[in-house]
Amino acid sequence: MKKAGNVGKKEYAVWIFVFAVFVFCLAWALAAPFDASPDESMRYQIVEFIAKHGSLPDGRDPEIRNANWGISYAFNPILPYMAGAVLVKIVQLFTASFRATVIAARMVNVLLGGGMAWFTWKIGELMFRRKEAGRFFAVLVCFLPGTCFLFSYINTDGLALFTTAWILYGWCRACKEGWSLSVCIQMGIAMGLCMLSYYNAYGYLLMSAVFFVGCMMKCQEQKWYWKQMMKKGCLMLGIVFLVAGWWFIRSGILYDGDFLGMKTSSIYAEKYAIDELKPSNRVLPVNMDMSVLDMMLWVPGSWQHNWLVTVLVYCS
């Protein structure tokens, strides 16, 4: 009876925490001026296009092309913008207020912030023996100003944070209970959604593969579970394809085999961007014939330190 009571208190605590994160992100989303955050107007154009036309935009469409950059965010995965368009259409049934539609589009990330809070709390429970340490970990991660900021405006970064938290939760579960069917299905869904977020989150997909393969080896006997590895690995890959494959197939068809859309985006930036923002005119390592080591030691503009020193200080 006492154990059941403790479990109930634990669940009660996690939902209080999720609600607190949700309210904080919502308050920030309600207070933030439109386009005060990075490229929010460009991102909102995608939401607006989907809500207006009821279809997904082509990244080359002049209607959504930014006059300065010469490109649009439609070249990249747009899942949060699709969800935002649904909420915008619902809000438009009641009001034509521009501010209301912006808040509706932001609500996708506010909800994702609450979802990340749940996964972070659960990760803390699995990683730390003392509940206080786990809760401190969750608070530290979810109330980091940068984290809350990303859940306050229209972007795909929020989905990246949500899915990477889900992936890390899957890793923790795999360590505790093995690669069960439930864990494999969750990992497949999480990785598929991660592919529909930002490309800079793909490192978690690579490390998930490394982690999974490592888990399939017996640590003491140094033998591989080949059959289980293939069976469960194919299951997860199949789920990833079902969740995310459609987007990359679509991009490949639209952009003549450019399934990531990055090459086409660069071509259009070079063609339509203002002179100082054209890829060929920007101060980039690739345009300066830098090696990887040169990039690490490079001190751009008015920065005080190079990349290597910055990373070392941050990690310390």
Question: What spans do the regions from the language model cover?
Answer:
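Transmembrane-helix signature of polytopic, membrane-embedded enzymes
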Residues: Y12, A96-R99, T120-F143, F162
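Transmembrane-helix motifs of polytopic, lipid-linked glycan transferases
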Residues: I103-F128, W166
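Short helix- or helix-capping micro-motifs
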Residues: V21, F137-C142, M191-M195
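Membrane-interface alpha helices of multi-pass inner-membrane proteins
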Residues: V183-Y199
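Transmembrane signal-anchor helices characteristic of membrane glycosylation enzymes that use polyprenol
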Residues: K9-S41, E48-D58, N68, M236-I253
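Membrane-lumen/periplasm interface segments of multi-pass, membrane-embedded glycan/lipid transferases
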Residues: Y255-S316
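Perimembrane helix-loop-helix junctions
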Residues: R173-K176, Y204-F241, L254
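Short acidic/glycine- and proline-prone juxtamembrane loop motifs at membrane-interface regions
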Residues: G146-L159
